[in-house]
Amino acid sequence: MFKTLTQNLTKIFDKLVSSGILTEAQIDAAMRDIRVALLESDVALPVIKDFIAEVKQKALGQEVIKSVSPGQMIIKIIHEEMINLLASSKSETKLNLNSKPPVNFLMVGLQGSGKTTASSKLALRLRNQNKKVLLVSLDTYRPAAQEQLAILANSVQINSLPIVQGEKPLDIVKRAIAEAKISAYDVVIYDTAGRTQIDKAMMEEALAIKKIVEPTETLLVIDSMTGQDAVVTASSFNEKLAISGLILSRIDGDSKGGAALSVKYITKKPIKFLSSGENLIDLEEFDAERLASRILDMGDIISFVEKAASIVDREEAEKTAAKLKKGKFDLNDYLQQMRSIKKMGGFGSILSMLPGSGKIMDQIDQSKLNSKIIEHQEAIILSMTPKERKNPDIINASRRKRIAVGAGTTVQKVNILLKQYKQISEIMKKVSKMNPKNLLRSGIGKLFS
């Protein structure tokens, strides 16, 4: 989401660091460049003014001008101020479950903001914390909206309130309250109707629902792709409904990122979650320090490790590790690794969490990061026989031609996959013979550069 902002800030930082001793004039110039970078990323003007003022005040201090590395000191100040801009207390960012069950959450937002998907993601997250969750759709206006929530709920074995055709939102709420008590649900998530724009009728209905439901959380889902409009939306909802927190959706999109840096500052309400993609596991707890590090191209290794841990099958990983110790790595293992990368959002998503990824992204062919490449490779491997996957060396020219036809691709693409497999196989075999303590010193990190 912050690709352009990250790249622009990285260029500014490179100038600062290479300058050595900094004058006040150079600091002023850097602040102007940062201001332009933030404006181009759709950050709200009041946010920019206060942010620049805070950074400049600290950057012009004698301890910075006289420090051994003034450029690095200013980057540190910017990092700290960005954390302050985004951060809320830990108690505020945590979901409020401190109420007698059933605990009610009210999801609000504009139509198309990703509210229904976010509701389902939140339900899955709570179910994985051993909570009994009921999903309730109150959107009786958008065609098939209730069915959409039911399908998403069913896909992850979460209960949704049965649909009664023609029922009004307030009547659905009353039925949900009764069902939650009878079936002893821990949490009920109400997915309210959205509109293409904010209107009086929408707000009045949401307010009436809120009075009946008495939610412990009223969560506004904001589409990160909407830029400056996100600030107007957040302000309006907060003014009318007194929201308790924010969920930023579509953070994996090609947006400028200004919404994330503005909505918390304007509403004074915490960002609780970041949502990406359609996969229901892709909901991450918001952490200001991690996001600030990602924006400033310092990487987010913690999120990388957490995401990997959540999608990797431990039993399969142990089997692969055991095979590697014996110097074995076949195309079944390669396919498993590709699928894990796909679940993590593809190569681009992984790279974005690594330090210095902004510069790397500039230097590589973006088409090579396309998740479709993984799907094509998957199709090629699945067109092979079990014997071929286990013994890739037997795949001769005629077999390659047959595999290409089966996968609907070219022999050249099959050759590329087999070449990549061979390279990775050689690396894996070398890694399996290494002492874990020597892995970092061996330059294994260069595989990602």
Curated annotation (Swiss-Prot):
Principal cellular location given in the protein's record: cytoplasm
Family, as annotated: Belongs to the GTP-binding SRP family. SRP54 subfamily.
Cellular component, GO, one term: signal recognition particle
CDD domains from the UniProt entry: SRP_G
Catalytic activity of the protein: GTP + H2O = GDP + phosphate + H(+)
NCBIfam families cross-referenced by the UniProt entry: ffh
Subunit structure: Part of the signal recognition particle protein translocation system, which is composed of SRP and FtsY. SRP is a ribonucleoprotein composed of Ffh and a 4.5S RNA molecule.
Entry binding sites for GTP: 109-116, 191-195, 249-252
Enzyme class name: hydrolase
Coiled coil start-end: none
Species of the source: Rickettsia conorii (strain ATCC VR-613 / Malish 7)
Keywords annotated in UniProt: Cytoplasm, GTP-binding, Hydrolase, Nucleotide-binding, Ribonucleoprotein, RNA-binding, Signal recognition particle
Name used for this protein in its record: Signal recognition particle protein
Its EC number(s): 3.6.5.4
GO molecular function: 7S RNA binding; ATP hydrolysis activity; GTP binding; GTPase activity
Function according to Swiss-Prot or TrEMBL: Involved in targeting and insertion of nascent membrane proteins into the cytoplasmic membrane. Binds to the hydrophobic signal sequence of the ribosome-nascent chain (RNC) as it emerges from the ribosomes. The SRP-RNC complex is then targeted to the cytoplasmic membrane where it interacts with the SRP receptor FtsY. Interaction with FtsY leads to the transfer of the RNC complex to the Sec translocase for insertion into the membrane, the hydrolysis of GTP by both Ffh and FtsY, and the dissociation of the SRP-FtsY complex into the individual components.
Domain notes: Composed of three domains: the N-terminal N domain, which is responsible for interactions with the ribosome, the central G domain, which binds GTP, and the C-terminal M domain, which binds the RNA and the signal sequence of the RNC.
SUPFAM superfamilies from the UniProt entry: P-loop containing nucleoside triphosphate hydrolases, Signal peptide-binding domain
Subcellular location: Cytoplasm
One Pfam family in the UniProt entry: SRP54
InterPro entries: AAA+_ATPase, P-loop_NTPase, Signal_recog_part_SRP54_M_sf, Signal_recog_particl_SRP54_hlx, Signal_recog_particle_SRP54_M, SRP, SRP54, SRP54_GTPase_dom
Gene3D superfamilies on file: P-loop containing nucleotide triphosphate hydrolases, Signal recognition particle SRP54, nucleotide-binding domain, Signal recognition particle, SRP54 subunit, M-domain
A GO biological process held by the record: SRP-dependent cotranslational protein targeting to membrane
